[in-house]
Design a protein with these regions (language model features):
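Active-site pocket-lining/capping segments in soluble small-molecule metabolic enzymes
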Residues: 1-113, 117-279
Length: 279
């Protein structure tokens, strides 16, 4: 799993991450191609054309980028566009540039539609993120990277119980590695993003209330008392709890966590014994 952040000159981890998203600035285009990209040859640089709401402005900026690329194809970068538009596709069709959209797939319809546009990456959100086994299989067959935001509680219905929304605890991030290619943190402050990177990529644990790190959680969920098996089924459950009501795993785990918290008990798995058992 690779990690991606938005560029900020205030970030202390800009040279650590695998991917950098940098917003296109027409006033700094020379600096972008002659200084920034050459300084990050070992990282994937993704130029974002997402600031302008005007389609024609985005097309003109895209033309400038493609023109520079055609003059020097040794420059390595990819492009992120705000959404699908046929005018964008017309400009890109005769290039070898890789591109994807800021818009996410939260349904099979959107997922299939994005695949049809030959994108390099797709963001997966909401209930579709509960079928990551199937999503990843199809995406990888099409040479498409699966991207997720782990630090946001995601649902198309914001009144849904928090425990039924998609999010990833730092303790569970390794379980998602077979299915997720890129982990990108949601936020706009460099210090905040640097902290997320440390928590998820380095520490892989959070001793406390998930409200403090998961955007959109409205209820207290103490990560210390969530049992280690929490993510194992959520990766591929398809949200059966909402389809037939037979699965209540998440709710039961939440109830159990409250009991464990009251008893001051923390459940842990011995990873060495677990590896020996699965060997």
């Amino acid at each position: 799993m690779k990690y991606c952040i938005n560029y900020s000159n205030k970030s202390h981890i800009i040279n650590k991450v695998d991917e950098i998203l940098i917003r296109y600035d027409k006033n700094k285009i020379l600096e972008l191609f002659t200084q920034f990209i050459p300084a990050h040859l070992n990282q994937r640089v993704i130029i974002q054309l997402i600031e302008e709401n005007n389609i024609d402005t985005i097309v003109n900026n895209l033309k400038k980028i493609i023109s520079i690329y055609n003059e020097n194809k040794d420059i390595k970068f990819d492009i992120q566009l705000p959404f699908y538009n046929q005018k964008f596709m017309e400009e890109l069709k005769d290039t070898n540039l890789k591109y994807f959209f800021k818009v996410a797939a939260n349904s099979w319809d959107k997922f299939t539609g994005l695949i049809s546009q030959n994108v390099s990456d797709i963001y997966i959100t909401d209930e579709l993120a509960f079928e990551l086994d199937k999503v990843a299989e199809i995406a990888h067959k099409n040479n498409i990277k699966v991207r997720i935001y782990p630090n946001v509680a995601q649902s198309r219905w914001d009144k849904l119980s928090d425990i039924l929304k998609f999010f990833i605890r730092p303790e569970d991030i390794e379980m998602y590695e077979p299915y997720v290619d890129v982990c990108e943190f949601y936020g706009d402050k460099a210090q905040q993003i640097d902290t997320y990177y440390k928590i998820y990529q380095e520490d892989k644990k959070w001793f406390g209330d998930l409200q403090e790190i998961i955007i959109g959680l409205d209820s207290k969920i103490d990560s210390r008392y969530i049992i280690p098996r929490f993510a194992e089924k959520r990766i591929k459950c398809g949200k059966d709890c909402l389809k037939n009501g037979k699965c209540e795993m998440c709710k039961r785990i939440l109830d159990l966590s409250e009991q464990l918290e009251n008893a001051h008990l923390i459940v842990q798995i011995d990873k060495e014994k677990e590896e020996d058992k699965n060997a």
